[in-house]
Amino acid sequence: MLFELRDVGLDRDGRAVLDSFSAGIPEGSTALVGPSGAGKSTLLRLLNRLADPDRGEIAYRSRPLSSYEPLALRREVALVPQLPALLEGTVESNLRYAAELAGERFDGEGTLRRAGLDPSFAERDATKLSVGEQQRAMLARALAQRPAVLLLDEPTAALDHAARDRIEAALAELRRQQELSTVLVTHDPEQARRLGDQVLEMPA
């Protein structure tokens, strides 16, 4: 099992944003669905150790998640947030920074292609991209780390159909090649079925 969650709870401002949640997330592609406020994005933050649970236990590859040093874990378990946050400079400089931070060999062209982008995209100014281009650049930046697991927080929520299709095509190819495991948060049940080997529904 990739991740195991046992009675996990997290409180914010005096209320439970996740309460007694238990689930197993296997290797492969898992889609998380559920109503707004169910804690889907919160769960991704917990899996990436951007937050730690107030109650319960999370295991990653049968080892307590809390035993992993956060930065070391994030090199292996990469998060693509819903809102793009690229650094100033070119797309290539963003990818190179991510690869170097993770101690990985930099392969700009290969990384861009895996994210569904043409290699010429490398010289684009990262701060002047469309929202769809930013999201694909964020996917490429996460892939530059060569993670074992990719966490995706509604990566197509703010995109038009064409941009959504490009992101989905890139994720479908990664899934087909079984390069890494993915955990995808989505409000779209159809997208969950298209991109998930397993669909995990989180209760309200």
Regions found by a protein language model. Give the residues of each.
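Conserved ABC transporter NBD signature motif
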Residues: 56-64, 73
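Hydrophobic anchor residue at the start of the ABC signature
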Residues: 139
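Conserved ABC ATPase signature
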Residues: 125-129, 133
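Catalytic Walker B motif of ABC-type/P-loop ATPase nucleotide-binding domains
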Residues: 150-154
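Conserved ABC ATPase "signature" region
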Residues: 105-121
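Helix-to-loop junction immediately C-terminal to a conserved catalytic motif
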Residues: 48
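Conserved catalytic motifs of ABC-family nucleotide-binding domains
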Residues: 83-93, 102
